[in-house]
UniProtKB/Swiss-Prot annotation:
Catalytic activity: an acyl phosphate + H2O = a carboxylate + phosphate + H(+)
SUPFAM superfamilies hit by this protein: Acylphosphatase/BLUF domain-like (SSF54975)
Originating organism: Escherichia coli (strain K12)
Entry EC number(s): 3.6.1.7
Recorded family membership: Belongs to the acylphosphatase family.
Sorted UniProt keywords: Disulfide bond, Hydrolase
Active site: R20, N38
Gene name as annotated: yccX
Lineage, uppermost ranks: Bacteria, Pseudomonadati, Pseudomonadota, Gammaproteobacteria, Enterobacterales
Impact when changing C5A: No change in secondary structure. Nearly identical enzymatic properties. Loss of activity in 8.0 M urea. Reduced thermodynamic activity. Inactivated after 3 hours of incubation at 90 degrees Celsius
Name of the protein: Acylphosphatase
Length: 92
């Protein structure tokens, strides 16, 4: 399977509820690299790179609501080409 990278923006109640940390846990469990970071508008930006099927699983997890404490309203995503090598999944 081919390697892909996506960038996603997750909207709803996703800050202050452990969203980035549980996203990091899920991404690492799936063998992905990238990051999750809070944005000023209250959303979370997620970059995920890895095997296409594993990236799709993370996207399904995000769209299904992520952690129990979060309330995801919508997820937007598009292909992404990071400027540097991502060697781990980090919180930014």
């Amino acid at each position: 399977m081919s390697k892909v990278c996506i960038i996603a923006w997750v909207y709803g109640r996703v800050q202050g509820v452990g969203f980035r940390y549980t996203t990091q846990y899920e991404a690492k469990r799936l063998g992905l690299t990238g990051y999750a970071k809070n944005l000023d508008d209250g959303s979370v930006e997620v970059v995920a790179c890895g095997e296409e099927g594993q990236v799709e699983k993370l996207m399904q997890w995000l769209k299904s609501g992520g952690p129990r404490s979060a309330r995801v309203e919508r997820v937007l995503s598009e292909p992404h080409h990071p400027s540097g090598e991502l060697t781990d999944f980090r919180i930014r």
